[in-house]
Amino acid sequence: MIQALLVAVGGAIGSLLRYYVGQWTLRLMGPAFPWGTLAVNVVGCFVIGVFAELIARRFNASVELRLLLITGFLGGFTTFSAFSLDAISLFERGEAVAGGIYTVASVGLSMAAVMAGLAVMRALA
């Protein structure tokens, strides 16, 4: 139960931060381009790289800290960071084909799923 709570707390903080970054970039740069989403995805990818190295590899941190920061906080801030870490991990393990398939499938299938969801709802309207 404590692990789920840590994920929830981290996720709430990450989600709030994502919201505030989105609002800030909207005020600063306007609505013509999704700057907020781009910002959280790039920053989240950098931060997950830092956390993965420090928490998991250098300090051998507890499962709870990983759940709070990586699964919770970064999961709430951006799921793109988790996707990117998974893809890089495949490439670093020498699994280039799997990494390429995972990357193309993740982006392609995600975009197809969004298009399908839009089409379903538009058809029902």
Swiss-Prot record:
One of its GO terms (molecular function) is fluoride channel activity. InterPro entries: FluC (IPR003691). Its main location: membrane. Na(+) is not transported, but it plays an essential structural role and its presence is essential for fluoride channel function. Keywords: Cell inner membrane, Cell membrane, Ion channel, Ion transport, Membrane, Metal-binding, Sodium, Transmembrane, Transmembrane helix, Transport. It comes from the Bacteria. Coiled coil: none annotated. Na(+) binds at residues 75, 78. Pfam families: CRCB (PF02537). The chain crosses the membrane at residues 1-21, 32-52, 68-88, 101-121. It is found in: Cell inner membrane. It is a multi-pass membrane protein. It catalyses: fluoride(in) = fluoride(out). The keyword RNA-binding does not apply. GO terms for cellular component: plasma membrane. The keyword Ribonucleoprotein does not apply. One of its GO terms (biological process) is cellular detoxification of fluoride. Belongs to the fluoride channel Fluc/FEX (TC 1.A.43) family. Fluoride-specific ion channel. Important for reducing fluoride concentration in the cell, thus reducing its toxicity. This is Fluoride-specific ion channel FluC. It comes from Rhizobium leguminosarum bv. trifolii (strain WSM2304). The gene is fluC.
